[in-house]
Amino acid sequence: MIKEKILSIVAFCYGIAYSKLSEETKFIEDLSADSLSLIEMLDMISFEFNLRIDESALEHIITIGDLISVVKNSTKSI
């Protein structure tokens, strides 16, 4: 459920079909993400899951799989 919601948000933010995304998709290389778009996406995910993800976490989020891990770990600590 977490993975599906995150994939939906990423698809919406970057205007790409959900079916074209995977955990291996890289934000910068594959989606041409920049820091502003990543922060906006992180805000949407924080709102959706009712949690706070520190922007410093962006340094470690290279792929969608990395983002899923961060969200899963954040929801466990609530």
UniProtKB/Swiss-Prot annotation:
Family (UniProt): Belongs to the acyl carrier protein (ACP) family.
Residues found modified as O-(pantetheine 4'-phosphoryl)serine: 35
Lineage of source species: Bacteria, Pseudomonadati, Pseudomonadota, Gammaproteobacteria, Enterobacterales
GO MF entry, a single one: acyl carrier activity
Keywords per UniProt: Cytoplasm, Fatty acid biosynthesis, Fatty acid metabolism, Lipid biosynthesis, Lipid metabolism, Phosphopantetheine, Phosphoprotein, Plasmid
Effect annotated for changing residue 57 to T: In plasmid pCP301
Record-annotated Carrier domain positions: 1-75
Location in or out of the cell: Cytoplasm
InterPro entries: ACP (IPR003231), ACP-like_sf (IPR036736), PP-bd_ACP (IPR009081)
Name the UniProt record assigns to this protein: Acyl carrier protein
Location (main, coarse): cytoplasm
PTM description: 4'-phosphopantetheine is transferred from CoA to a specific serine of apo-ACP by AcpS. This modification is essential for activity because fatty acids are bound in thioester linkage to the sulfhydryl of the prosthetic group.
Function: Carrier of the growing fatty acid chain in fatty acid biosynthesis.
Highest rank taxon of the organism: Bacteria
Gene3D superfamilies: ACP-like
Pathway(s) of this molecule: Lipid metabolism; fatty acid biosynthesis
Pfam families reported for this sequence: PP-binding
Gene transcribed to yield this protein: acpP
Gene Ontology cellular-component terms listed: cytoplasm
Residue ranges that the Swiss-Prot or TrEMBL entry lists as coiled coil: none
